């Protein structure tokens, strides 16, 4: 049993077919950021790994009202928030969402329809699998990837470890993962409880 593309589509609502997500590794990142976000990062806003610090996006795109009414600025703002979602949630690295991979910047350079044609679901699943493999190294203490996908998948596939949920009455067009938006209180650090429950499932 493992996470599949069907799970990604059902839980997150991301497309799992379309244009393959392949990022460039040789770009003028200052120019690429200027074209996509409308601002050029300062020297300190690049991580030593070459990735862009999320603080760059926070500095320029925190409040929608600062850009409302300016069509070009609204496009920059929206693309910045797509980048934030990718860098801190869907394709997060082990920095805990502090950095955004520059190789993804050119993928946001087209129109929104073009951006929507990428197979983001496939990229998210591939990225998560890679991080799950890497974290098996005993020297690693952190993990990148879409943790919320992994967590909701585990709750769905192993109901005994899931928090209590009210009856599900989905809104038209919403994906399955939305039903977990109502979860307010659960104990995430009960390691002993989860181990005992999983041991019981395996018997």
Predicted regions and their residues:
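Structural stabilizers in ordered domains
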Residues: 1-203
